[in-house]
């Protein structure tokens, strides 16, 4: 007897909100588990005791969702198997690599026999440049090519975390909770993306889509920079530098309210989320609210800026990214405290960005600026300015939430014929700023 009642509730919610799910077929139901006591984060991560029984479950699930949502809808979804199978058997990996390869092949065949048009991905692979984990996925794809089960798209987990440092004693656990050995390079994600593109070409995979299914600069739920303006600027920099090289970015995570670890009894404890456990947006949340307002026509980019267009309007994203110092990357906090977390940036000077936009049609324009920095849009910094004490009442939480909105300023500017629009902006350390240039009709224009 198969019951998918809980899944129905989740998928119904996804569908009614006009979203498309990516279904990862894991964890293992305990009644199918070969090793019932093998658990991670409270769920079973064992291989099945019977691959045929597993495939029967997958088949019944496909029948169920097809009957409920229709095959045409299902074909717009994505499906995948397992999570990070290239990690050790202390995590998601199988003790015997060949067991996983056959497990994947059987699941792939089950899904493609049901409907060849269903998109089936590479199992989300934890990518570490230069490590044996990288070789795993290359070997796996070669095996898939030989066994007629090549995935339809590539899927990766990536963190800017070094796994070779003695300080990160838990290499086999990838430092999920306490990883403190971070990349010293500000371009770690870009280097990873370029490496994957080269490997895709070497494997002869053409333009196979590449999805970043889990990404952050750290997997740690206790990295104090997660709450600060560093994270909002990190998100903007890395998405804009790589937007045309990947097919998706999946940020880890939406909220600090994660079940993987016990939650500290603090508001800002360095959690990965865009929201605190109380639902207060962090600066990182506003990075996405600004990014989504960019236009669909790319015009240009450079150091600290990105320009788009939508119809007759222009959008310019500015950012002043600085990377933390070598000592912090290797786990030394020194004078960093709960209420002073910016001491790890050697260069704290503001930066001035000057841009000239030519061929702007004559007319009157509204220039709107929305910005996130330590004074505006950062709930952590607002909490510090309120005294840095733990909040205890709904009134206090509400005050903080209302005080943490981004800054905003707008003005009108008239552009004469053949005039160049000159913009000059000074950005604080780790500030992000969206400038929107929109044509308006003024009374004087109408009278003409």
Regions found by a protein language model. Give the residues of each.
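Aromatic-lined substrate-binding rim segments of carbohydrate-active enzymes
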Residues: 1-62, 66, 94-123, 186
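C-terminal beta-sandwich/jelly-roll accessory domains of carbohydrate-active enzymes
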Residues: 319-448
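A solvent-exposed, charged loop/short amphipathic helix patch at secondary-structure junctions
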Residues: 40-45, 167-185, 330-346
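A structural motif corresponding to the C-terminal end of an alpha-helix
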Residues: 10-20, 64-75, 106-118, 147-150, ...
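Noncatalytic carbohydrate-binding groove/subsite architecture in carbohydrate-active enzymes
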Residues: 96-246, 267
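Aromatic/acidic polysaccharide-binding cleft in carbohydrate-active enzymes
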Residues: 212-338
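Active-site-proximal loop/turn and secondary-structure-junction residues that shape catalytic pockets
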Residues: 27-29, 83-87, 124-128, 160, ...
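Conserved, mostly hydrophobic/aromatic
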Residues: 14, 61, 79, 107, ...
């Amino acid at each position: 007897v198969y019951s998918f009642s809980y899944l129905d509730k989740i998928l119904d919610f996804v569908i009614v909100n006009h979203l498309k799910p990516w279904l990862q077929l894991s964890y293992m139901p305990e009644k199918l588990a070969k090793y019932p006591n093998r658990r991670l984060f409270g769920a079973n991560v064992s291989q099945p005791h019977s691959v045929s029984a597993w495939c029967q479950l997958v088949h019944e699930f496909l029948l169920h969702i097809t009957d409920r949502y229709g095959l045409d809808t299902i074909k717009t979804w994505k499906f995948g198997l397992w999570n990070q199978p290239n990690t050790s058997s202390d995590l998601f990996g199988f003790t015997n690599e060949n067991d996983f390869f056959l497990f994947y092949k059987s699941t792939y065949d089950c899904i493609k026999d049901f409907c060849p048009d269903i998109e089936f991905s590479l199992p989300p692979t934890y990518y570490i440049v230069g490590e044996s984990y990288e070789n795993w996925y290359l070997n796996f794809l070669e095996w898939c090519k030989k066994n007629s089960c090549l995935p339809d798209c590539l899927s990766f987990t990536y963190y800017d975390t070094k796994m070779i440092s003695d300080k990160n004693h838990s290499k086999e656990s990838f430092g999920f909770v306490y990883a403190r050995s971070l990349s010293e390079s500000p371009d770690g994600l870009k280097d990873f993306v370029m490496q994957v593109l080269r490997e895709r070409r070497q494997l002869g995979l053409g333009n196979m889509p590449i999805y970043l299914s889990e990404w952050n600069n750290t997997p740690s739920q206790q990295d104090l920079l997660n709450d600060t303006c560093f994270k909002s600027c990190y998100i903007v920099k890395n998405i804009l530098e790589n937007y045309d090289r990947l097919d998706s970015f999946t940020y880890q995570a939406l909220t600090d309210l994660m079940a993987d670890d016990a939650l500290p009894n603090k508001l800002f404890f360095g959690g990965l989320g865009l929201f605190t456990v109380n639902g207060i947006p962090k600066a990182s949340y506003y990075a996405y609210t600004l990014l989504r307002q960019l236009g669909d026509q790319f015009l240009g980019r450079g150091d600290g800026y990105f320009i788009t267009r939508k119809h007759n309007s222009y959008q310019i994203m500015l950012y002043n990214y600085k990377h933390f110092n070598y000592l912090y990357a290797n786990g030394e906090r020194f004078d960093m405290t709960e209420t002073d977390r910016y001491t790890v940036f050697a260069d704290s000077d503001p930066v001035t960005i000057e841009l000239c936009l030519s061929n702007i049609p004559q007319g009157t324009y509204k220039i709107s600026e929305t910005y996130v920095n330590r004074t505006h849009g950062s709930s952590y910094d607002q909490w510090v300015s309120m005294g840095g004490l733990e909040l205890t009442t709904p009134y206090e939480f509400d005050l903080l939430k209302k005080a943490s909105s981004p800054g905003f300023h707008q003005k009108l500017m008239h552009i004469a014929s053949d005039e160049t629009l000159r913009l000059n902006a000074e950005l604080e350390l780790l500030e992000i700023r969206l400038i929107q240039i929109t044509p308006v009709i003024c009374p004087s224009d109408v009278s003409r």
